[in-house]
Amino acid sequence: MSAIETSRAQPAVAYVPAQDNPHLSVLLDMRPALDGFYGIPQETRLLFSALAALPGLCVSGLLQMSTRRVKGGVAQGAASSEAERVHRYSKAVVSLKGQSVTDWKEGVSDWLGALLHKWALRWGAWTGATPIRLQQFETRAFRDFIWQQLFARSVPPTEREQVLRSDYRICSSPWRWMHLAGIERAWLLGKSRYPRLDTRGVDVLIAQTPYPGRVSAGTMLVVHYHDAIPVLMPHTISDRAFHEASHFQALAANVRDGAYFVCVSEATRRDLLSLFPEAEARAVTIHNMLPSHYHPEAVEPGRVPGIVRRHLHDEYRPRGGSAKTDRSMYKLAKSFSNEAEKSAFYAQAFGPGSRFVLMVSTIEPRKNHARLIEAWEVLRDRLDPDLKLVLVGHIGWDHKTVLEGCLPWIEQGGLFMLHSVPAESMRILYQQATVAVCPSVGEGFDFSGAEAMRCGGVVAASDIPVHREVYGDAAVYFDPYDTQSVVHALQALVYADDAQPRAETLRAAGLEQSARYLPERIVPQWEAFLRGLAGGGAQV
């Protein structure tokens, strides 16, 4: 069955016009937006901005940290002075930014409070008593913090006022602690259950991953489901024992509790239903949306050398590492004797007539950097010793093999590792790259190929179901487990006699394919889904 046919088989969601339900309260989990540029953090920001613009929806954000308590905030309905309210909001900002104790005495008190907090979460998971009360946070006095911390990395400034109209609720309980409370219960009784959030007054809570909590009566939980990789490919993830258990146990509990699931691709929906077929009537597919930063208008190729120089990783120091052979530091940028030599090198390496292959992804096993590097080495040896490789992304986990393989090429001036590249600069790289490569062995959606297409780039991708679904006929595909397959795909795109006309055909197809993920295509699907929930839920 094709992706289109499978997509048609999913339950239809009834659409209720906005005027029939003018005050739908939506609480959106913003935890992923506190960190990271791309992927789930980006989609979280874009979705919040898009929903905040819809008439008849009252959208607020849920502020929660992964491993630290969020302090401050004001209890709903509490009588307090303006000064006291601002002070308590300010405490929340401090705790969201990092350490929030002033001396050792407060540190001891904080440690004891954390111990009691964990036992309260266990009690809530076991008994369902003492729901977690959500504190209020008003944006008005902290507009700069909310914009810079949550939205600026993905949302265009033209939407700034739109997102700053919303307020927030604070969950003081760390996400990881809530997960552990449910996992511990599953260890003893064979079935997970989680603490309950006091979500009275909220119609829909949208979580960005399987959520370690239950909601109040009258609130519907919607899980924005990005992938099942922690369960289906646990060998590729970090902190494997915790992430596999937390994902599966929370997902199982969400399914039992009647949650709805918005999957980012039909491939992800199939993975969900392979684990929990009973969720079929409550699982729909709405693809991720692309940010408006990415568009095909011509860029200035002369800016590429400067972009590469500004965003080089330079030095990277791994955390931990017990083996004596582990490096304490990786030098991830080429050395130069003086600034003039450095400037001349980058101007030549990325000047007129230069070619570079681009990959945008966190460095982690599933992304398959090593395979691309092997294929690129073959192309340099056989055909083009001047072909460059640009890797954009943060350094994740299990990265030693990839980084060790990069070091000699970095010093030779053939490979460049970048990070924290803003969207406008990424648009230039996508458009100027000879080809953008997406070699992953597993994905839930994979933004990078669709973003490259939207910028007018040429894409080669691994032949996995989600890439076939998301990229359609606008990419060249290869076997991600076969280096020669990658070589042949890139050779055909770059060096074959018909490479130029083929690239132009792919650019045109990519613009059409990527248009499916523009906000004007995706947001109406979200609105229909949410109105459908308010109007009685999904209808099969």
Label every PLM stretch briefly.
Residues 2-540:
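Carbohydrate transferase catalytic cores enriched for Leloir-type hexosyltransferases
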